[in-house]
Amino acid sequence: MAAAKGIAIGIDLGTTYSCVGVFQHGKVEIIANDQGNRTTPSYVAFTDTERLIGDAAKNQVAMNPQNTVFDAKRLIGRKFNDPVVQSDMKLWPFQVINEGGKPKVLVSYKGENKAFYPEEISSMVLTKMKETAEAFLGHPVTNAVITVPAYFNDSQRQATKDAGVIAGLNVLRIINEPTAAAIAYGLDKGGRGERHVLIFDLGGGTFDVSILTIDDGIFEVKATAGDTHLGGEDFDNRLVSHFVEEFKRKHKKDISQNKRAVRRLRTACERAKRTLSSSTQANLEIDSLYEGIDFYTSITRARFEELCADLFRGTLEPVEKALRDAKMDKAKIHDIVLVGGSTRIPKVQRLLQDYFNGRDLNKSINPDEAVAYGAAVQAAILMGDKSEKVQDLLLLDVAPLSLGLETAGGVMTALIKRNSTIPTKQTQIFTTYSDNQPGVLIQVYEGERAMTKDNNLLGRFDLTGIPPAPRGVPQIEVTFDIDANGILNVTAMDKSTGKANKITITNDKGRLSKEEIERMVLDAEKYKAEDEVQREKIAAKNALESYAFNMKSVVSDEGLKGKISESDKKKILDKCNELLSWLEANQLAEKDEFDHKRKELEQMCNPIITKLYQGGCTGPACGTGYAPGRPATGPTIEEVD
């Protein structure tokens, strides 16, 4: 057995599932847990007698929803009044309380109420992963690399590190999930010439797009974009809402307020979603779901795709943003890599493939395991593994925001530009603004706006003792130096005297949240017009798609048989199908094209629908109140004579 001190593990701490790997004997082993599963649910449950972690916790969730905690990753490193926390709280069956501005999860454990910080919940999941690795290796393990989404801010990274410490781990480094996946991918491919790789990571709870350049074993992150709140859970939510409505229609009962019923339904929905990645239909059978009523139903892949259409299409926006940030055309991307269980959804793959003009997607890495695989390799590198496979690998990350200082008139002068590779060091010469100025105030900011008042102040310090001289004569050398962990050192030195002063800006100085980073980037004037155009385009696209789907369901309704001629019905269905196919191939068309296509469809449908209503109403469809643009499943409206 190898000496314990020489072994380090890689942990993918996911929102919904976690995974652990170890690099030994020249290859990565992804380690199965005690249930034989290679991924473990990021769930912790508390009962009257015990604490359960992983599969055991998830398996009993329907019976004990209030005391089963998941999604700790959505809380970690956030304040209680963070809008993300406030909106998520509405969806969780467990209770979140405010303690000194920080969120804590309140549960009943062994008969008494206990409150846990998110770091504590995450540390329990990490402990489970640590024990899984120890059972496989046969000795204790303390060293680990843990991954986080690329957009996690410093407090979220620090809190994740704290969770590792609570779990008894020595956290060697926190690395980005897409970066970890890139390492896995780089090892699989071997470095032959420069390649641009787009990593599309759609997991259970977060979505990240990263563009990397891999050249001869050197990885460079060119750009990252994403959404901290998009993933498999959101697709589950759409299915849950769909079936809650169906139950209401069939049985005239609302189950949405019954936490246990919703939880059981959610479990069945997750299973159905997975089935739909390989089959075109999935059946749900839930005995005694609510008030003794059995719920047996089914859903097709097409209906699932329709329910999540906007979410699926929305995954292309961060792809476009990352390409813009990397100043790269989509034709320049050599490989598209799928990471995260949700990338198994055929529609997601199809949209991405269409966007890249039918290019093949790289699915050679198991999407659930790629991140842990890369983390395990990085752990081996940090432990000094001399294996030929890893020794030439070098990893470069990027700064998510520009860093600079305030110059005369409150202007932001950036020394390190957004998306610069880190570690990095930049030096610039500044001078005094007035005659005989005895000192300068160095104020360090991060952000994309032209004026410092619109950016985020990270810290400030004075450099004094400058010899009297006319303005513009003294030479003050300012150096910005970021290390591999994102810690910034700013030094100012008067070149005539050699006198210097410095400040270190570390992770715990309350850096920006992802939302603020996004706000500052999007607020920047140059993006305003572009954002507006994009919003209008998406609204027009959605309007066209929903109108086409509505028309299809109106004319296909059984209750309208005999009210509409087969030729009219065929005409509408053919036109709708033609437009939906066009949409498939042109998701990124212009607003005017979408509007034009919708008007075209309306001009064809309106006379037929009007004729339908003027024909009177005697059949079973009487009173269903169909109208152009109204969903076929809309509310019943009584007809007035």
Curated annotation (Swiss-Prot):
Organism whose genome encodes this protein: Macaca fascicularis (Crab-eating macaque)
Region of interest (Nucleotide-binding domain (NBD)), ranges: 3-388
Region Substrate-binding domain (SBD): start-end pairs: 396-511
Gene3D superfamilies for this protein: 1.20.1270.10, 3.30.30.30, 3.30.420.40, Actin, Chain A, domain 4, Substrate Binding Domain Of DNAk, Chain A, domain 1
Domain notes: The N-terminal nucleotide binding domain (NBD) (also known as the ATPase domain) is responsible for binding and hydrolyzing ATP. The C-terminal substrate-binding domain (SBD) (also known as peptide-binding domain) binds to the client/substrate proteins. The two domains are allosterically coupled so that, when ATP is bound to the NBD, the SBD binds relatively weakly to clients. When ADP is bound in the NBD, a conformational change enhances the affinity of the SBD for client proteins.
MF-aspect GO terms: ATP binding; ATP-dependent protein folding chaperone; heat shock protein binding; ubiquitin protein ligase binding; unfolded protein binding
Purpose: Molecular chaperone implicated in a wide variety of cellular processes, including protection of the proteome from stress, folding and transport of newly synthesized polypeptides, activation of proteolysis of misfolded proteins and the formation and dissociation of protein complexes. Plays a pivotal role in the protein quality control system, ensuring the correct folding of proteins, the re-folding of misfolded proteins and controlling the targeting of proteins for subsequent degradation. This is achieved through cycles of ATP binding, ATP hydrolysis and ADP release, mediated by co-chaperones.
Name used for this protein in its record: Heat shock 70 kDa protein 1-like
Binding annotation for ATP: 14-17, 73, 204-206, 270-277, 341-344
